Amino acid sequence: KGVDTYSIIANRGEGGQNEIGSELGNALGIIRTRELQEASKVTNVTLGILSESINDPIYDFGFSKSPDETLAKWGEQVVYERLIRKIRELRPDVVIPAFLNEPSTHGHHRAINVITVKAFKDAADPSVFPEHLQHGLRPWQAKKLYVPADEKDYTVRVPVGEYDEVYGASYLQLGEESRFMHKSQGMGRHYDEGPSFNYYKLEQSTVPSKARESDFFEGIAYTYDDLAREVAGKPDGETLARELSTLQKDADDVIAAYPRFADVAREVHDMLSDVQRALTVVQEAKLDEATRADLTHRLKVKERQLYTASAEALSLVAKVRPETGELVAGQTATVKVTAYNGGQVPLKDVSLKLNVPEGWRAKPLGATSFGQVGYNQTVTAAYEVEVPKDAPLFQPYLPPSITADVSYKAFGSTAVSRVVPSDAVAVLPPFSLSLDPGAAVLNTLKPQEPISVKVTVKNYQPGAAEADISLDVPAGWTVEPKASPLAFAAKGETKSVAFTVKPSAAVKSGTYTVTAVARAGAKESRHGAQVIRYPHIGTTYYVQPAELMIQAFDLKVPEGLKVGYVSSGFDNIDEYLKQVGVNVTLLSAKDIESGDLSQYDTIVLGIRAYGFRPELISSNARLLKYVENGGNLVVQYHKPEDNWKPELAPYPITIGTPLIEWRVTDENSKVTMLAPDHPIFNTPNKITEEDWNNWIQDRSAYNPSQWGKEYVELIANGDPGEKEFTGTFLTAKYGKGTYTYSSLVWYREIPALVPGAIRMFVNMVSLKQ
């Protein structure tokens, strides 16, 4: 129907899992933001995100069962103000939350439903966030609020299975094409052509409504003729009504001209002239301010739509191309703006304007205006861009730093096409620093054990460069060497330097930070630039402090402990086991199928391993035989769809469904140790209540609902006010060995260096000893 549509998203998915790479946390949020942006292009939807910056309060803190928990963690007033602001900016006629507030739904989705329903009326109340008026945002009352429904109880049925001959797909298929962009979440399905419907129920309305409606806009002024009838009785209403009726005829003419592109362009530009004239009439008319604001907004939206339609109909291809997207403060670079005319209509008075941030300088290197551009011709304007010496480092959630406006005249009216570079243009640190390891354990039982740190440095300055690399360490600690000079022959060259950090002999338990520093004259870098590059989202960056977090606590690790680790690709616990002194071998398919498993004291299966290591299914009998002969097998959480079957365990274990009901999301929830004398809680590390403190995001995921009586139930734990689970941590003797199944979220806690989680995991892999 050509309705101007917006998708407002709360957070950026930082707390999820990554199905295409190793990025987690903020880096994953950056990927998912770019995926949202690309998905929005597919469906021609304008994207808005309430989370505004890295580590914003509206953060994906992981799975939540309730809207109350979500709003408490986000700050209800923070998220509500931003949603009300969006509604007042966009002034929608119809509002639809994507999810219902029901127990089977993620708490983040439920929270947005709750505040969206509330905002339907509050956005129109001038006493709600009155400060918006100071920024030119007037209260706004949407006409209707719908919520998702089903075929048993609905108001509107949307035929998403209808085939669109222009797009060559059904709307359901187009939607899935958009969902396929969310590759980090594994989204997207293939649907055949054929009837399909989405259902929605009218929840609130300010206009007369019926039990069944033909579409969302029944009873709402939908066409320019509808608007003309609404304003006809107002002061200067007859003049306005004539202008609006003219626009209705224009719109009909545009549609009738399709697919004759040149004719479409002519009608678009006729309508553009009429829209711009109507805007002037609205400003001069004796209207009440609410009506003036409404008409102005609608006409501005139409003007923007016509700009897009003009470029499409004229086959205008506009691009902005920096010689490099990787800049540093003080650098000068060339940026080119091009306009190609692929249509038969000559473009006149073509202007290529480069837009840069305040404080930047963009100097034309030649012509930027061209009298006429004919069919199959390209014009180019080159600019010398100077980045100020105090330019802030790249922030991935801000609008693009460089854009271009291509303006041109056709059929007597001027249109503007705004373009952005295909990849991010980023101000990066002159020297990007990364530390390996990125997090480290300091065992206070061995305080003088040195920590080896490798600093990798990438030169982002144009040309050759030199820098002295050093580490800032806590007071009383030492580092060798104190500094190391590096010389780079060209931009993009990467070199590494090794340091040895020695903690103070009196180091106490706690968190310490080591920072990498690159100094080159007056320039100093203390940041790293993580390059994030995938085919479906292009290139972007995560700039963050170049820091190594060190967690100091006491940890006993048996000598000579040998562990085989079967990775699913979704966790990196093996790296941290190595770091604390465990001899870890990553097991290949061949190792699992035919290798000597008896050489390992313990074999650990990473999260969801049965779903992503098919050899585990065919070799499961070998694993159980390994246990029976005296081995120690540790299995981390699985979902039913990970090929999990109860009989994979030596005694049956059934995973609870629906999955949403079988997890503990409060990382601070009380844990009771049901078998406090079990070796897992005593050997080699004594586990106390303190070891359950400072966990992050969750306690457990996808807990078992049934298990054999042979298992020892190690803990009881549940979210506040809910039943406790006793199948979260199960262990059993099998033959001469031990089998342990745990749905505690070790994969989150151990990389976060949670002391209790690391101490318990070491105990778990030490059971044979």
Where in this protein do the model-derived segments appear?
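Active-site rim/loop-helix segments in enzyme catalytic domains that contact anionic ligands
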Residues: K1-E89, R110, V117-K121, D125
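Metal-dependent de-N-acetylase/amidase catalytic core
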Residues: K65-V317
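Low-complexity, acidic Ser/Thr/Pro/Gly-rich terminal tails and inter-domain linkers that flank the onset
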Residues: T291-G330, V420-T444
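Proline-anchored loop/turn motifs at beta-strand termini and strand-loop-strand connectors
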Residues: G342-Y375, P388, Q461, A465-K491, ...
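Short glycine/proline/serine/threonine-rich loop/turn segments at secondary-structure transition edges
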Residues: V387-T403, A505-T513
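Aromatic-Pro/Gly-enriched surface loop or interdomain linker
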Residues: E524-G606, Y637-K639, L659, R663-V664, ...
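A glycine-rich, often tryptophan-bearing local segment used as a flexible ligand/cofactor-contacting loop or short
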Residues: R608-N693
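Catalytic beta-strand/loop cores that center a nucleophilic Ser/Cys/Thr
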Residues: L659-V754
